[in-house]
Amino acid sequence: MKMNKNHKTVLVILNIIVSFLISSCSSPKEQVRIGNGTFTIEGKDIQLICGEMHYPRIPHEYWRDRLKRARAMGLNTVSAYVFWNFHERQPGEFDFSGQADIAEFIRTAQEEGLYVILRPGPYVCAEWDFGGYPSWLLKEKDMTYRSKDPRFLSYCERYIKELGKQLSPLTINNGGNIIMVQVENEYGSYAADKGYLAAIRDMIKEAGFNVPLFTCDGGGQVEAGHTEGALPTLNGVFGEDIFKVIDKYQKGGPYFVAEFYPAWFDEWGRRHSSVAYERPAEQLDWMLSHGVSVSMYMFHGGTNFEYTNGANTGGGYQPQPTSYDYNAPLGEWGNCYPKYHAFREVIQKYLPAGTVLPEVPADNPTTTFATVELKESAPLRSAFHQTTQSENVLSMEDLGVDFGYIHYQTTLQKAGKQKLVIQDLRDYAVILIDGKQVASLDRRYNQNSVTLNVSKTPATLEILVENTGRVNYGPDILFNRKGITSQVLWGNEKLTGWSITPLPLYKEKVSEMEFGETIKGVPAFHKGTFTVEKKGDCFVDMSQWGKGAVWVNGKSLGRFWNIGPQQTLYLPAPWLKEGENEIVVFEMEDTGKRVLQGLNQPILDSLGIDKNYQKGQRRAVVGTPILEDGDLALKTTLQETNEWQSFDLPVATTLRHFCIETLASYTEDNQACISEVELIDDKGQPIDKTKWEVVYVSSEQADKNLGIAENLFDGDISSFWHTNAAVESNHPHRVIIDLKEIYKVSAFRVKVRKGSFLSGKVKDINIYGRPLSTKYIQ
């Protein structure tokens, strides 16, 4: 067909238009930019006022409720970790439905006028089991996590690719509301492998996340944790340090504190973390007034339903409870603490002119139910589905189990009084002989043996082991297998011939068990019913029980433990029925009491009797603390005097953990002895010592508490910390103290023990400070 000149001109123009349209579709408009010291979103400069909240820790039915409360407090952004092990519980099998539908959570945030900062890890910490890693990674015993191990990176890539399919369409450049994506998480507190960081960064880009990337680290760890092409941000840093640190890597900012801590998380057996609102509100005010973008960790903590809590090992093995209330502005059940209203007042001062915040939604209704007694029981074996025969013990990971419990059974052939040793117990064990419970062992106290008297043989030995939470922070994430991870000895004999049954009870259909007469004194399930007239949030009071887990209408509320501080379990209103409701309790440590009730307020700060604690016993610390040059706050020499000595820090330091390291003594015995220490805040005031807690001590004179590390801050100058004189040791000696709150410290005061002829008169010391937990190496 012959074409004239006009036809050709029209075709050329059409081709240009089509090419432009294709180009426009394939290259979305850049809606978020970082430059000139600011964040620019949709053409406008913005100060990010952000809060962290986690979709698995909030009932799906309450996502919108919590997001509305975030917007009403003044937040313009929410930050959210993505939990790998919540989506890929078995290799290659992904779940993004229901409670795991993070895309719906993000779209709901957009509908409520909130941007989203995505934190996909793959490692996330978050006081979550294994820091978000799936437990099946542990099957490959020689694989190294958070490294360039090719096998590990291949699993990371599969996960991130799948995440990209689900979430990359929701970036702001694709019409959604995801404005930034984080690369890894606090990596500088773990290692400094730039190749590994670059690999994770590139995976995120290749997965389609076409928005700015960032890293987050403590102030002294940015060098190790930062990667090219990602904005460096800070965790736990306050004041002028924000500018000093960031300017080393990105002169002029923008400045973003990706984790600002209004409070802290809890652990089993310790008091509930509670921080008054005044100081955090002042810190928030300072940051906003100085143009710093900020994300509060947490804005709303929520709940570790099922068995998802993690554990730390900084001060011994420290598992976290079911409640992740965090003493955040918005409490576990969506309640507004005074901190919420104080923060709202601060934020309102910095909103654009004419901006009116939404009204704070009314409190959600609560309900109660009367005391009920659970009279029906089912034996532990009701949950036995698949038993494996093995010559040697196997771990939970060997059997493909992520959470819950594992049951071991064998036969004892030798009678008499012998020591039963469970090597590398992870984490809590109940021991039965011929069906009778005879002992329990607790990893928190490094308990791994008990002496038993077996009068008749053969005798049946049963060991029920609970995974109370995989380590989520520090080098110990490499040692996270659960159950019995080595061997069991009876006297000097290694026990063999095991029947092993995994019990991942969080997905157990407890309602279908056959219940009958009550069972006492051994692990068992107990069932009852209660009635509510109207649905409302409720708190199941488990303070009369020992240790176990609860289901209501088939929904797993998580675990309880009467040592506290948590004594209630949160029961969300959507999981209740008007009228009769079924409750099932698994009791691992039976108290003989079968009563419970529903309250309209939680009990989060009530310590009970810890049956495994022995007087004078300190939590078993695993490893040696790593002290980094970036955390060194003061290096000085003490005078040979008994008077108080004061030292200004060269630079005021933001810290929560601080370490006293002795390097030399005036005496020649290599001992160390100090009577009392004080820290002075940035306003020149002594910091309250009533909440301080020792999390590590390299040596102490523990006999009759004569020279324990707690004497350093007991307010009594006649008491003292003294290294163990009965054990030969050299400097350095170290004590690490948790202040339980982040402070800006300007000075250090110390008083050595009074007396002329005393051992351990300290001469040279270092003081280290970290806003985050101390890390350790084995």
Which positions does each model-derived feature cover?
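Extended substrate-binding grooves/exosites of carbohydrate-active enzymes
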Residues: 30, 34-62, 68-72, 93, ...
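Aromatic-lined carbohydrate-recognition surfaces of secreted/lumenal glycan-active proteins
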Residues: 119-121, 172-185, 203-224, 230-236, ...
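Carbohydrate-binding surfaces of carbohydrate-active enzymes
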Residues: 156-182, 193-194, 201, 209-210, ...
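Disordered, acidic Ser/Thr/Pro-rich linker "stalks" and the adjacent N-terminal cap
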Residues: 386-391, 553, 619-655, 666-745, ...
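Extended extracellular/luminal ectodomain segments enriched in beta-structured repeat modules
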Residues: 413-419, 532-539, 652-657, 730-732, ...
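Aromatic-lined ligand-binding clefts that engage carbohydrates, nucleic acids, or primary amines
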Residues: 418-432, 461, 530-553, 560-561, ...
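Short beta-strand-plus-loop segments that form exposed binding edges in beta-rich domains
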Residues: 463-469, 585-591, 661-668, 753
